[in-house]
């Protein structure tokens, strides 16, 4: 696009855009790069560049600008290192600055990664920020950014500078004695000055021998001699010697640092290039923010669809945004109408925004605006204010048009201002039509302006061609600068004359002098203008309604999300509270069981039903915890019924049926289960129908304890269960069997790996309610089952 750019950059004022871009860059190399930024015709390259601008804009919005400060171009220093030359302090200080900035930006990038901010389009630059630690450490110890060598560069330099400071103090003390004591009468002024790096006194000429020493200089009149007193001569000599040693040590340090830097030329260059590129891209994002620009949506279909596009160089408070289209339902747009209405600015806006996008810059248009990537952009744009053009201007205009016609292709954009102007109107109009017909055959995208009325019908007679015009406010007698696509320019001469007070009869006569065809065209344009305005107003109203609906939907969704989050938080809090309560109750139940077991081991008499009752309470707590975990609280609440004395109920913690015999409290009852009376809460019982408790039992057994069970079975099958699950079920089963009065039960555990079988045997061995146990006979399962006798 070099040829295209060299011709249109000045006309479209693209150079003013990149000057603004350069001003927003921080480093000198990035500023220079910005001034060289040219649009690209490679779609992939443009998209990549736009992506980078988007990433930096997002970073600027979320985290702020990158920590980059100005540094000088390191390439001259690297060239010197390449030929083994030594660098001075300023050059090494600049390299140290580059490495320090690389470290800072690297940390900045790490923070972006932690915040999960996308940096993929600039990843290669971030990866190049690799600082050689040994070089950085040495430079940090030895040199300042401005090139000053630090005291810490070497122990020798530190000692030398200490000695220099101490010796200088001694010199000043001696000299101060001269200018404040009895010797002041011999001095022209009571000051200490320096000549040739040595401290001297301004002595009157006639007293030059009073101080001894050496005369270093004299005043212009010869009345004052600058004398180095004999008393400080030795100190000054020592000072000069120390300073010479300091210079020598600094020289040695710079040589050492240069040699170390020479080993990392590639790394230094990579860091500098990465910082330059990141600064350059950051400038793009800053320009977008400054202009309130948005990311263009690129397409490969040569479609332009700009919404509320505004010229980026016109005051935002004054510029009028316009919708501009090409390549949708038409490829050629003719903007007709009088001069000074904004036709040229519209062309320039289209061309400049297209150039900006192809340079990877954001555009001054509404979000979602579409642009494409053209191979070339041809433009012939003159001065909008020039109504009459000279023959030489017409020749220049035609010369440009001919070049465009000879080179344009379907992949190009053509912008022509006042096509065919500068010659006889009739010939100019005919020439414009012929040129347009020729250009349209190339299938390029074309936008032209003209004030020839003959072209008004062109858009209606040619395929994929449309008219457009700049709106004019008849009440204010001023252009509105709004583009009206689909409507040709309307002549407003009669309306303006009437508004200004011209005799109505004169205006009417002028209308009568117009031929019927022209009159009909103007009436048609007037109707189209009114219809378009009405349609646009309706569209704007509908758009506002849609935007409000989208906003409301977003607010409602946010509210719903917040509500769901609050509900979830409350559920989690309730779960935590319930877990704490259940853990507390579990400890209480375990303490009861442990106390009972302790009493038994101590020889006390503990009733079996007390132990079982305590275990039942523990089982109840475990089941409540499971219900909470599975979120089945509401299901249990639905099943619960109001109960009262005399109701037949099922006690959930025991899995047994009984009858409520007494109400102990608001939520507490006494239930008779066989001969056993237990205390329960209303949450632990379910009311059952009277007939349910009188069903024929699966197995009815009366024990010596007199307890009858309608639910207990003489067998328990543990096959297929996990180890812990099997032992838990075994414990509960034996409790229920004891309550049911069963004397003998069979535990089916299978053979398998023997884990459950061994676990069962170990459990039975410890349980004091087990009288004896043995494997079942061969015909009843053998070692796959155990017969247990209870006591």
Swiss-Prot record:
A molecular function (GO) term: endonuclease activity
Domain of life: Bacteria
Segments of skewed composition (Low complexity): 703-713
Spans annotated as Disordered: 689-715
Enzyme class: hydrolase
Binding site for ATP: 337-344
A Pfam family per the record: MutS_V
Segments forming domain Smr: 716-791
BP term (GO), one: mismatch repair
Gene3D superfamilies, per database record: 3.30.1370.110, P-loop containing nucleotide triphosphate hydrolases
EC nos: 3.1.-.-, 3.6.4.-
Key words, A-Z: ATP-binding, DNA-binding, Endonuclease, Hydrolase, Nuclease, Nucleotide-binding, RNA-binding, rRNA-binding
Alphabetized PANTHER family for the sequence: OS10G0509000 PROTEIN (PTHR48466:SF2), OS10G0509000 PROTEIN-RELATED (PTHR48466)
Family the entry assigns: Belongs to the DNA mismatch repair MutS family. MutS2 subfamily.
Function as written in the Swiss-Prot or TrEMBL entry: Endonuclease that is involved in the suppression of homologous recombination and thus may have a key role in the control of bacterial genetic diversity.
Description of how the protein assembles with itself and partners: Homodimer. Binds to stalled ribosomes, contacting rRNA.
Protein's name in the database: Endonuclease MutS2
Annotated organism of origin: Lactobacillus gasseri (strain ATCC 33323 / DSM 20243 / BCRC 14619 / CIP 102991 / JCM 1131 / KCTC 3163 / NCIMB 11718 / NCTC 13722 / AM63)
Gene for this chain: mutS2
């Amino acid at each position: 696009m070099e040829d295209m750019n060299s011709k249109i950059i000045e006309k479209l004022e693209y150079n003013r855009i990149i000057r603004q871009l350069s001003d927003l860059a921080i480093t000198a190399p990035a500023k220079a790069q910005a001034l060289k930024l040219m649009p690209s015709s490679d779609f992939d390259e443009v998209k990549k560049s736009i992506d980078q601008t988007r990433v930096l804009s997002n970073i600027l919005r979320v985290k702020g600008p990158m920590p980059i400060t100005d540094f000088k171009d390191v390439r001259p220093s690297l060239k010197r290192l390449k030929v083994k030359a030594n660098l001075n302090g300023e050059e090494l200080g600049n390299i140290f600055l580059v490495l320090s900035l690389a470290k800072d930006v690297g940390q900045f990038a790490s923070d972006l990664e932690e915040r999960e901010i996308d940096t993929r389009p600039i990843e290669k630059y971030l990866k190049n920020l690799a600082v050689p630690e040994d070089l950085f450490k040495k430079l940090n110890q030895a040199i300042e950014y401005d090139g000053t060598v630090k005291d810490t560069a070497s122990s020798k330099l530190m000692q030398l500078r200490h000695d220099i400071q101490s010796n200088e103090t001694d010199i000043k003390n001696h000299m101060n004695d001269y200018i404040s004591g009895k010797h002041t009468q011999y001095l022209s002024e009571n000051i200490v000055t320096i000549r040739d790096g040595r401290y001297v006194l301004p002595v009157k000429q006639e007293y030059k021998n009073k101080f001894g020493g050496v005369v270093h200089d004299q005043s212009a009149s010869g009345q004052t001699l600058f004398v180095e007193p004999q008393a400080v001569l030795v100190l000054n000599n020592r000072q000069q010697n120390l300073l010479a040693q300091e210079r020598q040590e600094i020289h040695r340090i710079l040589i050492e640092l240069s040699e170390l830097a020479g080993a990392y030329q590639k790394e230094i260059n990579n860091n500098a290039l990465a910082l330059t590129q990141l600064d350059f891209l950051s400038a793009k994002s800053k320009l977008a923010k400054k202009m309130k620009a948005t990311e263009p949506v690129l397409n490969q279909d040569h479609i332009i669809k700009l919404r509320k596009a505004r010229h980026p160089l016109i005051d935002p408070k004054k510029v009028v945004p316009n919708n501009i289209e090409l390549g949708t339902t038409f490829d050629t747009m003719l903007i007709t109408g009088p001069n000074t209405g904004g036709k040229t600015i519209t062309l320039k806006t289209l061309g400049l925004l297209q150039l900006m996008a192809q340079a990877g810059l954001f555009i001054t248009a509404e979000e979602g605006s579409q642009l494409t990537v053209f191979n070339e952009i041809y433009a012939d744009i003159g001065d909008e204010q020039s109504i009459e053009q000279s023959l030489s201007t017409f020749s220049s205009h035609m010369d440009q048009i001919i070049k465009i016609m000879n080179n344009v292709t379907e992949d190009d954009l053509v912008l022509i201002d006042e096509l065919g102007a500068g010659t006889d109107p009739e010939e100019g109009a005919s020439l414009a039509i012929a040129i347009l017909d020729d250009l349209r055959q190339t299938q390029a995208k074309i936008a032209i302006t003209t004030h020839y009325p003959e072209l008004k019908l062109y858009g209606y007679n040619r395929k994929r061609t449309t008219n457009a015009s700049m709106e004019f406010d008849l009440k204010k007698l001023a252009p509105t600068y709004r583009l009206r696509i689909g409507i040709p320019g309307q002549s407003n001469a009669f309306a303006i004359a009437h508004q200004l007070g011209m005799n109505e009869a004169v205006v009417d006569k002028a209308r009568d002098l117009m031929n019927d065809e022209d009159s009909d065209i103007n009436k048609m344009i007037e109707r189209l203008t009114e219809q378009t305005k009405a349609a646009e107003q309706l569209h704007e109203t509908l758009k506002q309604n849609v935007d409000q609906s989208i906003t409301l939907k977003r607010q409602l969704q946010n509210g719903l999300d917040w509500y769901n989050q609050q509900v979830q938080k409350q559920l989690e809090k309730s779960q935590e509270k319930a877990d704490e309560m259940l853990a507390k109750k579990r400890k209480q139940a375990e303490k009861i069981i442990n106390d009972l077991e302790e009493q038994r081991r101590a020889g006390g008499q503990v009733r079996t039903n007390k132990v079982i009752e305590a275990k039942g309470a523990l089982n109840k707590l475990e089941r409540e915890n499971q219900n909470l975990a599975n979120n089945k609280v509401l299901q249990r609440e639905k099943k619960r019924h109001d109960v009262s004395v005399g109701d037949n109920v099922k006690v959930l913690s025991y899995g047994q049926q009984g009858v409520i015999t007494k109400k102990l409290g608001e939520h507490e009852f006494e239930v008779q289960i066989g001969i056993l009376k237990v205390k329960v809460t209303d949450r632990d019982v379910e009311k059952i129908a009277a007939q349910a408790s009188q069903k024929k039992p699966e197995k009815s057994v009366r024990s010596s304890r007199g307890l009858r069970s309608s639910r207990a079975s003489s067998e328990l099958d543990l096959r297929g269960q996990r180890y812990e699950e099997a032992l838990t079920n075994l414990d509960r089963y034996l409790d229920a069997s004891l309550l049911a009065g069963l004397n003998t039960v069979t535990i089916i555990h299978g053979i398998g790996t023997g884990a459950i079988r061994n676990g069962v045997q170990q459990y039975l061995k410890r349980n004091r309610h087990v009288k004896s146990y043995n494997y079942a006979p061969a015909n009843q399962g053998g070692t796959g089952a155990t017969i247990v006798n209870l006591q």
